[in-house]
Amino acid sequence: MADDVGNLHSQSAEIGPVGLYLVKVVVGDVGTPGAPIVNLALTVDAPSGNVSGIAEITQAVQGGNHRFPVSGHIYHTGLGQDQLLVSLQGQFVYSVPPPAIGSFLANFRAGLAVDKTWNGHGGFDYLNTHIDNVPVKRV
């Protein structure tokens, strides 16, 4: 035990980014025809766990593209290999397709389970679209 004390200064632990940083991720089955994909550009305040940024949904259907602000929080599992649990929410204006007339605010929610490099799995939902257990990849 006494031998360990002298080595404390030379031991290192892997620590994620500190302070304020930018991260970009893609959520979804990229390459699957017609699958909705969410691109996220997020500013992370590591000390507080607050996250905010822009989400962009792309889907190869009429009215399938949306760009809007999101915000949320990051939680740490603290168990074994520490994972980041990211909760995001936002709203965007959705215009109903013709022949209907009108627009309304649509809710968006996302939940991601990522490692310190921001790779993992997650899901999101908006309107009548619910996507679970898709890849999350840092870009």
Model-derived segments and spans:
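Beta-sheet ligand-binding and adhesion/scaffold domains
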Residues: 2-11, 29-32, 39-41, 74-139
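N-terminal glycine/threonine-rich, aromatic-flanked beta-hairpin/loop signature
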Residues: 44-65
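A generic structural micro-feature
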Residues: 34, 62-66, 102
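Generic short beta-strand segments
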Residues: 22-28, 54-58, 88-94
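Short, surface-exposed loop/turn motifs at beta-strand boundaries within globular domains
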Residues: 18, 33-37, 46-48
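Charge-rich, low-complexity N-terminal segments
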Residues: 11-13, 19-21
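Surface patches in mature domains of proteins
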Residues: 64-77
